[in-house]
Amino acid sequence: MITLGHLLGLGAVLFCISLAGIFLNRKNVIVLLMSIELMLLSVNVNFIAFSRELGDTAGQLFVFFILTVAAAEAAIGLAILVTLFRTRRTINVAEVDTLKG
């Protein structure tokens, strides 16, 4: 049987992997977006774990809200990424440090 400790451990491992992805790869926007999505997934795992342990459905409702916000964030991020690639021909974060008026 899966206990609360197992689920919290899984959430912590996912969070650490996403944090490492953000700090180790700061050049590729796609990897940064994927790392942020993985971080939100680890938070969702923790919400589900505590919701299951306490017998309360509020954690599951928060998960649906977070998934909705994450989907909107991913769509906006990818739209910005496509626009960035069309104008600059790169998705490297280091080359996109200047604003154009």
From Swiss-Prot:
Top class in the EC scheme: translocase
GO molecular function: NADH:ubiquinone reductase (non-electrogenic) activity; quinone binding
Keywords: Cell inner membrane, Cell membrane, Membrane, NAD, Quinone, Translocase, Transmembrane, Transmembrane helix, Transport, Ubiquinone
BP-aspect Gene Ontology terms: ATP synthesis coupled electron transport
Swiss-Prot/TrEMBL catalytic activity: a quinone + NADH + 5 H(+)(in) = a quinol + NAD(+) + 4 H(+)(out)
EC number: 7.1.1.-
Membrane topology of the entry: Multi-pass membrane protein
One Pfam family here: Oxidored_q2
Protein family: Belongs to the complex I subunit 4L family.
Entries under PANTHER family matching the protein: NADH DEHYDROGENASE SUBUNIT 4L-RELATED (PTHR11434:SF21), NADH-UBIQUINONE OXIDOREDUCTASE SUBUNIT ND4L (PTHR11434)
Subunit structure comment from the entry: NDH-1 is composed of 14 different subunits. Subunits NuoA, H, J, K, L, M, N constitute the membrane sector of the complex.
Function: NDH-1 shuttles electrons from NADH, via FMN and iron-sulfur (Fe-S) centers, to quinones in the respiratory chain. The immediate electron acceptor for the enzyme in this species is believed to be ubiquinone. Couples the redox reaction to proton translocation (for every two electrons transferred, four hydrogen ions are translocated across the cytoplasmic membrane), and thus conserves the redox energy in a proton gradient.
This protein's name: NADH-quinone oxidoreductase subunit K
Organism for this UniProt entry: Xanthomonas oryzae pv. oryzae (strain KACC10331 / KXO85)
Species lineage: Bacteria, Pseudomonadati, Pseudomonadota, Gammaproteobacteria, Lysobacterales
Name of encoding gene: nuoK
